[in-house]
Swiss-Prot record:
Pfam families, per database record: 2-Hacid_dh (PF00389), 2-Hacid_dh_C (PF02826)
Name of this chain's protein: C-terminal-binding protein 2
Family: Belongs to the D-isomer specific 2-hydroxyacid dehydrogenase family.
GO MF entry, a single one: transcription coactivator activity
Length: 445
């Protein structure tokens, strides 16, 4: 009996676990703090206060996927990105620990969401991002085409004398009345609806085509719905695009569809550059089939008038993918993206994510499977980080000491502020959470 007592090990109380000793991580080494990286930017001042108690935040400022640092490829659990780089399957396979990508914006055509899902990487967006700004910019482009303010300004800058009625008629040739014109919207999501409300105030008759939208919305907004793209093109004096880009609508506006438009119609695109065949558009502008076009997005970005099919196209207004931008919109988008990353760290992927766009492709990877309930006591709820290849148990008394994340070529990011534990109300691994899915239909522009 004495021999048994000699080798008998007293079970440690659960509340003593946190006293300088961390629970063992299952299936992998201990990772003190997950790494979250901003891939194509360098300003983390908005994101860091939201994530500083959970993760080390760093940036790459990459202009291409080849510039993403090896440390990020090997260690980053979460990534945030704008629209300036593209992640293909080959690029996604280079990430060793990545579990969630948040696109700071509404469009996600620059990420292979199917490949990401198959690799166990959730992709999220901010569907409400910059709706007001994009709608305002779209209406500005429409008004500019009708009232020709840009061309009138250029004429004065070039020294054109405008005094007599004949001179006014010559320099303002092409200006048209707005009231009574028909504006056709392709895609009637958040931005499309915001444009419709604004356009009606200027006297437009608004019609829209959106095969994904349920019936009834047209009645509440006082607009007319058409059920084929051909009908919309045939009836519209001005066509504006408000749909996401996918494999089904690439070059939606091409030589064939342009010929279905009214002679001398206008075209506006502040959605995605790939929706318009720029070669066909340039030819239509030169021939006068399209009276004028305004583009905020382009097939190849950054856009330059010095090259590409549109360099010699007349009656064309181009802006550098800035329709979405305002200080307020940028702040809101970044806060929403960081908050989504926080949900991913503290909850389950993809169940805890509010705006995951690739759930149908998502495959739960083995290292991130449901935690054995015997491994985590209920008192530690909210203090467990799901970090591959295992689980990091964090004491309720606090997180590990602050770490410094340095990405060569960027500014060192140091966390000196005291850290605190997760809120106790954070969802446990097997606790169901409510989430919203913004993919009711693809036309959320």
């Amino acid at each position: 009996m004495a021999l048994v007592d000699k080798h008998k090990v007293k079970r440690q109380r659960l509340d003593r676990i946190c006293e300088g000793i961390r629970p063992q991580i299952m299936n992998g080494p201990l990772h003190p703090r997950p790494l979250v990286a901003l891939l194509d930017g360098r300003d983390c001042t908005v994101e860091m206060p939201i994530l500083k108690d959970l993760a080390t935040v760093a940036f790459c400022d990459a202009q291409s996927t080849q510039e993403i640092h090896e440390k990020v490829l090997n260690e980053a659990v979460g990534a945030m990105m704008y629209h300036t780089i593209t992640l293909t399957r080959e690029d996604l396979e280079k990430f060793k620990a990545l579990r969630v990508i948040v696109r700071i914006g509404s469009g996600y055509d620059n990420v292979d969401i199917k490949a990401a899902g198959e690799l166990g990487i959730a992709v999220c967006n901010i569907p409400s991002a910059a709706v007001e700004e994009t709608a305002d910019s779209t209406v500005c482009h429409i008004l500019n085409l009708y009232r020709r303010n840009t061309w009138l300004y250029q004429a004065l800058r070039e020294g054109t004398r405008v005094q007599s009625v004949e001179q006014i008629r010559e320099v303002a040739s092409g200006a048209a009345r707005i009231r009574g014109e028909t504006l056709g919207l392709i895609g009637f999501g958040r931005t499309g609806q915001a444009v419709a409300v604004r356009a009606k105030a200027f006297g437009f008759s608004v019609i829209f085509y959106d095969p994904y939208l349920q019936d009834g919305i047209e009645r509440s907004l006082g607009v007319q719905r058409v059920y084929t793209l051909q009908d919309l093109l045939y009836q519209s004096d001005c066509v504006s695009l408000h749909c996401n880009l996918n494999e089904h609508n690439h070059h939606l506006i091409n030589d064939f569809t342009i010929k279905q438009m009214r002679q001398g119609a206008f075209l506006v695109n502040a959605a995605r550059g790939g929706l318009v065949d720029e070669k066909a558009l340039a030819q239509a502008l030169k021939e006068g089939r399209i009276r004028g076009a305004a583009l905020d997005v382009h097939e190849s970005e950054p856009f330059s008038f010095a090259q590409g099919p549109l360099k010699d196209a007349p009656n064309l207004i181009c802006t550098p993918h800035t329709a979405w931008y305002s200080e307020q919109a940028s702040l809101e988008m970044r806060e929403a993206a960081a908050t989504e990353i926080r949900r991913a760290i503290t909850g389950r992927i993809p169940e805890s994510l509010r705006n995951c766009v690739n759930k149908e492709f998502f495959v739960t990877s083995a290292p991130w499977s449901v935690i054995d309930q015997q491994a985590i006591h209920p008192e530690l709820n909210g203090a467990t980080y799901r970090y591959p290849p295992g689980i990091v148990g964090v004491a309720p008394g606090g997180l590990p000491p602050a770490m410094e994340g340095i990405i060569p070529g960027g500014i060192p990011v140091t966390h000196n502020l005291p850290t605190v534990a997760h809120p106790s109300q954070a969802p446990s691994p097997n606790q169901p959470t409510k989430h919203g899915d913004n993919r009711e239909h693809p036309n959320e522009q």
